[in-house]
């Protein structure tokens, strides 16, 4: 039906007759002529309809926004005075000789000239996606997928599919369950990741695997999460963790160079413990210059129990953030930051303004200064390298609360005070994660997943002191977002059984849930390691947006609903009967 895309017309086509298909982006009547800005996925071009073209001029008079149309015409170069530098095709226009209305459009439920609610945009997503901004995002995501396939193919990886209907395994989030009609009362689970199947592929001899695959997690949602998401899944045999990082770092480095013409440079490597200590997060945003500084040793002996209590608790922490120029913050602003850290479990936010460093104690303004000696205050000022005009903010509590609360405060300060360099890219690797973490009741859980190999210990050593073990795991972080995570996997049945035991999975349950894996590990399993990227999150960063829904064609809401199709919906009673399922809905309480 067409010979060219609207957005691809240029001066090299001058004098040629072309056929274009697309939509009316805008119509203008000027000096007897009708001007149509015609749009397709590649861009917009101006079409001129002359009243002398008597066959098509009356049809052009009928055109309204979003009519689906076809134009035939001659590409003409615009006079210099009429060149539109705001359009990629602004040097040319199409002089129409033929016009067909393919389909008319009713008045749109969305207004492209104003901000529409997200609910409206999701309900009429097929219209929202016509906007050039959205179209460009989806196209950039497609280019990213294409680049990944090309890169991995060239590096001898094999694209192999794994099952979507599989068995429920504990991987941290709730599974989406699918009832079996044949095996009544039994359920499949949609995969949270292809983790075990890709490990089995390594055992099968396919030493370099990848897959761009849908994964499903029934978890609470936020701006950068969806119930169904796309993963770039990678697994290798006979590569060390460093070698896996080298390959996957090059993938991202080359992707940014090709798609954005950005040179990321070599990614720094940071141990988990350093990330938590300096930034309060295992996915630090290095564009933000603020850091946490530990001062527990300086306040151990003060009478102020808010500080000395955590300072003398082996599980406690006292840390501060120095905010350059922060002395200008008002009490109302400081109270707002106190409310912010409360969200993360902190009980308050002590502060100290350094109005004049040279004036000694006279230059200090703080509600807690009266509880601290001059030596302690000077020690804090020296350690943080505080200067006149700065403010120091304190966090004192259990170490986990301090890290989370002060880490979140650091990010908010960086945004509010424009300290974070939003024009920069700051990738890094975070490595040497703890193998296990406590759940608050003394039980251990795998920090990543139970198939991650410990670092530098055998099974007996791991069982003797599991809480002290680190894992051979690694996360790639860009601008504060974890975009990929991976690890060396356990490749011996002895070690896998030991890890299951530490996690409280008894022998019988091990066989019920993971018997196939433990059996497979007996037959010459190679050492293997891998990584999975979140394609949605990578695309979000590439497109410069902060909402993952902006780079997914048909996303769900934060309530895991599809406003376009009204999914999820009640099932047909006959279908439920065939599946031997009875649905019991909670009764709604009557309002008084």
From Swiss-Prot:
Residues that, per the record, bind L-aspartate: 171, 217, 448, 489
Sorted UniProt keywords: Aminoacyl-tRNA synthetase, ATP-binding, Cytoplasm, Ligase, Nucleotide-binding, Protein biosynthesis
Binding site for ATP: 217-219, 226, 482, 534-537
Region span, Aspartate: 195-198
One Pfam family cited in the UniProt record for this chain: tRNA_anti-codon
Entry's Gene Ontology cellular component terms: cytoplasm
GO biological process, one term: aspartyl-tRNA aminoacylation
Domain of life according to the entry: Bacteria
Record EC number: 6.1.1.12
Record GO terms (molecular function): aspartate-tRNA ligase activity; ATP binding; nucleic acid binding
Catalyzed reaction equations: tRNA(Asp) + L-aspartate + ATP = L-aspartyl-tRNA(Asp) + AMP + diphosphate
CDD domains on file: AspRS_core (cd00777), EcAspRS_like_N (cd04317)
Subunit structure: Homodimer.
Family: Belongs to the class-II aminoacyl-tRNA synthetase family. Type 1 subfamily.
Name of the featured protein: Aspartate--tRNA ligase
Species the sequence originates in: Vibrio atlanticus (strain LGP32) (Vibrio splendidus (strain Mel32))
């Amino acid at each position: 039906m067409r010979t060219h895309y609207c957005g691809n017309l240029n001066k090299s086509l001058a004098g040629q007759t072309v056929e274009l298909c697309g939509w009316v982006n805008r119509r203008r009547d000027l000096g007897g002529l009708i001007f149509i800005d015609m749009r397709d996925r590649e861009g917009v071009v101006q079409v001129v309809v002359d009243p002398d073209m008597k066959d098509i001029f009356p049809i052009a008079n009928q055109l309204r926004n979003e009519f689906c149309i076809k134009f035939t015409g001659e590409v003409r170069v615009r006079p210099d005075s009429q060149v539109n530098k705001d359009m990629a095709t602004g040097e040319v226009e199409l002089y129409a000789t033929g016009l067909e209305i393919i389909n008319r459009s009713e008045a749109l439920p969305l207004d492209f000239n104003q901000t529409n609610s997200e609910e409206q945009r999701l309900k009429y997503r097929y219209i929202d996606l016509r906007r050039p901004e959205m179209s460009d995002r989806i196209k950039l995501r497609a280019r990213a997928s294409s680049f990944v396939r090309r890169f991995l193919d060239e590096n001898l990886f094999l694209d192999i599919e794994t099952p979507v209907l599989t068995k429920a395994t504990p991987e941290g989030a709730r599974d989406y369950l699918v009832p079996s009609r044949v095996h009544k009362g039994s359920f499949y689970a949609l995969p949270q990741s292809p983790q075990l199947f890709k490990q089995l592929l390594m055992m099968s001899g396919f030493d370099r695997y990848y897959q761009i695959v849908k994964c499903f997690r029934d978890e609470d949602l936020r701006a950068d999460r969806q119930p169904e998401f796309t993963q770039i899944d990678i697994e290798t045999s006979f590569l060390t963790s460093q070698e896996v990082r080298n390959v996957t770092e090059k993938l991202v480095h080359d992707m940014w160079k090709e798609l954005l013409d950005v040179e990321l440079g070599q990614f720094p490597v940071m141990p988990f413990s350093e990330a938590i200590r300096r930034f309060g997060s295992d996915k630090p945003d290095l564009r933000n210059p603020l850091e946490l500084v530990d001062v527990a040793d300086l306040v151990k002996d003060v009478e102020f129990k808010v500080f000395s209590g955590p300072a003398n608790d082996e599980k406690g922490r006292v840390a501060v953030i120095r905010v350059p120029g922060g002395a200008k913050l008002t009490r109302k602003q400081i109270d707002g930051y106190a409310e912010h850290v409360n969200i993360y479990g902190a009980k308050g936010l002590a502060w100290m303004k350094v109005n004049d460093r040279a004036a000694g104690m006279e230059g200090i303004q703080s509600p807690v200064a009266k509880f601290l000696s001059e030596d302690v205050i000077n020690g804090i000022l020296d350690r943080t390298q505080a200067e006149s005009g700065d403010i120091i903010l304190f966090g004192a509590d259990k170490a986990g609360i301090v890290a989370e609360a002060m880490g979140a405060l650091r990010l908010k300060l960086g945004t509010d005070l424009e300290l974070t360099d939003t024009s920069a890219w700051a990738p890094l690797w975070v490595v040497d994660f703890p193998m296990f973490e406590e759940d608050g009741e003394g039980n251990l859980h795998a920090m990543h997943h139970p198939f991650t190999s410990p670092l530098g210990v055998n099974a007996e050593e791991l069982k003797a002191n599991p809480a002290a073990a680190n894992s051979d795991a690694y996360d790639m972080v860009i601008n504060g977002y974890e975009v990929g995570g991976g690890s060396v996997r356990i490749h011996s049945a002895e070690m896998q059984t030991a890890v299951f035991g530490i996690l409280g999975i008894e022998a019988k349950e091990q066989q019920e849930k993971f018997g196939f894996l433990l059996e497979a590990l007996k037959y010459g399993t190679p050492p293997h390691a891998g990584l999975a990227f979140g394609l949605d999150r990578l695309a979000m960063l590439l497109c410069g947006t902060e909402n993952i829904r902006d780079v997914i064609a048909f996303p769900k809401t934060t309530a895991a609903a599809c406003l376009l199709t009204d999914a999820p919906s009640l099932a047909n009673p006959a279908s439920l009967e065939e599946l031997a399922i009875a649905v019991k809905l909670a009764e709604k309480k009557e309002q008084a």
